From Swiss-Prot:
<comment type="function">
    <text>Dual-function peptide with antimicrobial and potassium channel-blocking activities. Shows inhibitory activity against Gram-positive bacteria such as M.luteus, S.aureus, B.subtilis, and M.luteus as well as methicillin-resistant S.aureus (MIC=0.1-20 uM). Does not act on bacteria by disrupting membranes. Also moderately inhibits Kv1.1/KCNA1, Kv1.2/KCNA2, and Kv1.3/KCNA3 potassium channels. Inhibits potassium channels by interacting with the pore region. Does not show hemolytic activity.</text>
</comment>
<dbReference type="Pfam" id="PF01097">
    <property type="entry name" value="Defensin_2"/>
</dbReference>
<feature type="disulfide bond">
    <location>
        <begin position="4"/>
        <end position="25"/>
    </location>
</feature>
<keyword id="KW-0929">Antimicrobial</keyword>
<comment type="similarity">
    <text>Belongs to the invertebrate defensin family. Type 2 subfamily.</text>
</comment>
<dbReference type="GO" id="GO:0005576">
    <property type="term" value="C:extracellular region"/>
</dbReference>
<keyword id="KW-1015">Disulfide bond</keyword>
<feature type="disulfide bond">
    <location>
        <begin position="15"/>
        <end position="35"/>
    </location>
</feature>
<dbReference type="InterPro" id="IPR001542">
    <property type="entry name" value="Defensin_invertebrate/fungal"/>
</dbReference>
<keyword id="KW-0964">Secreted</keyword>
<protein>
    <recommendedName>
        <fullName>4 kDa defensin</fullName>
    </recommendedName>
</protein>
<keyword id="KW-0211">Defensin</keyword>
<keyword id="KW-0044">Antibiotic</keyword>
<dbReference type="GO" id="GO:0042742">
    <property type="term" value="P:defense response to bacterium"/>
</dbReference>
<feature type="disulfide bond">
    <location>
        <begin position="11"/>
        <end position="33"/>
    </location>
</feature>
<dbReference type="InterPro" id="IPR036574">
    <property type="entry name" value="Scorpion_toxin-like_sf"/>
</dbReference>
Length: 38
C-alpha cells in the first residue's frame, strides 16, 4: 500500500503527511509501507 512496492517515494510522502520523518517499503516483497518511528 501507499506506493509500495514500486513507488517508495509515495510511501515516504504518506509517512511525512502523518508527521513521521519518512518511511520505506518493507515486508514480504516490499509490499508494506513502513513509517519510521520518530
Amino acid at each position: 500500500g501507499f506506493g509500495c512496492p514500486l513507488n517508495q517515494g509515495a510511501c515516504h510522502r504518506h509517512c511525512r503527511s502523518i508527521r513521521r520523518r519518512g518511511g520505506y517499503c518493507a515486508g514480504f516483497f516490499k509490499q508494506t509501507c513502513t513509517c519510521y518511528r520518530n
